[in-house]
Amino acid sequence: MSTAVINTDDDQLEPTLQSILDQKSLRWIFVGGKGGVGKTTTSCSLAIQLAKVRRSVLLISTDPAHNLSDAFSQKFGKEARLINGFENLSAMEIDPNGSIQELMGQAEEGEGPAAGMGGMMQDLAFAIPGIDEAMSFAEVLKQVKSLSYETIIFDTAPTGHTLRFLQFPTVLEKALAKVSQLSTQFGPMLNGLLGANGSLPNGQNLNEMMEKLEGLRETISEVNGQFKDENLTTFVCVCIPEFLSLYETERMIQELGSYHIDTHCIVVNQLLFPKKGSDCDQCNARRKMQKKYLEQIEELYDEFNVVKMPLLVEEVRGKERLEKFSEMLITPYVPPAGGL
């Protein structure tokens, strides 16, 4: 695990994300958790803080229900675009689920990276579960690698989909094996159909497809290796102090550990701090429940930086509110006088 900041006064890990800002070697940062816990707000806020201490930062949403555009009140798409008001912070929204359709569209039209492989691509997509996500994710990584961003932050899909990319090298290996099997099985028949340029009459080319798959596999294997390097990659878990969210967080941390991916920070959102003597029974009851789960989080993850974020009265949208929220990720929130 990466070295986290220690508070020497009480020998507790500092309750901030300052350790991530201080670790200059980090290239990939993933922000994930259960749906509705504030992942996007947290990833946007972390990106804002990182932009202050990095040459260039890219924020990527891989959640099909994209929220970056809403968070910054600015439309983003598949191409990286500078966020208004920043000179070194860009964002893009991609959908790792379904871009195989686009790839197949290019194949049928005879253009793009899949030119001349339409029917074969479709057969392959149906033959191997997950190949569409694997190939589209690999294409995204190729694009990101060609750009010169110092740090890349992923605002991920809800838990369950978040770690699929870890299986992609295996999926692509299966794809290559399938293509190889097709080549062996139908080789003699294909030889009789091949034209002078080594292509089928309809323009499909088996060798071309294998080369492209191999190229994607190499790209994703290289990045996958970087993901397992604690000097280059870390995962920030986001949760709220409730049973299901805590359960999902524990499951995710266990899974990250099994894939050797570093994680040492947890952001706990939506904390209530009712004033002493408050006559709001619901507030007090909820705070009591939150306190119980917060104590469990601190006990379970005593080697983590646990960041406690308050429930705010206003929605965190727009540059100014995100900047204000982001300050609390690096300066511990202090409840108003009289808060519990």
Curated annotation (Swiss-Prot):
One of its GO terms (cellular component) is GET complex. CDD domains: ArsA. NCBIfam families: GET3_arsA_TRC40. This is ATPase get3. It is found in: Cytoplasm; Endoplasmic reticulum. Belongs to the arsA ATPase family. InterPro entries: Anion-transp_ATPase-like_dom (IPR025723), ATPase_ArsA/GET3 (IPR016300), ATPase_ArsA/GET3_euk (IPR027542), P-loop_NTPase (IPR027417). Transmembrane segments: none annotated. It comes from Botryotinia fuckeliana (strain B05.10) (Noble rot fungus). ATP binds at residues 34-41, 242, 269. The gene is get3. The keyword Kinase does not apply. The keyword Repeat does not apply. ATPase required for the post-translational delivery of tail-anchored (TA) proteins to the endoplasmic reticulum. Recognizes and selectively binds the transmembrane domain of TA proteins in the cytosol. This complex then targets to the endoplasmic reticulum by membrane-bound receptors, where the tail-anchored protein is released for insertion. This process is regulated by ATP binding and hydrolysis. ATP binding drives the homodimer towards the closed dimer state, facilitating recognition of newly synthesized TA membrane proteins. ATP hydrolysis is required for insertion. One of its GO terms (molecular function) is protein folding chaperone. Its EC number is 3.6.-.-. It is an enzyme of class 3 (hydrolase). One of its GO terms (biological process) is post-translational protein targeting to endoplasmic reticulum membrane. Its main location: cytoplasm. Keywords: ATP-binding, Cytoplasm, Endoplasmic reticulum, Hydrolase, Metal-binding, Nucleotide-binding, Transport, Zinc. Zn(2+) binds at residues 280, 283. The active site is at 63. Homodimer.
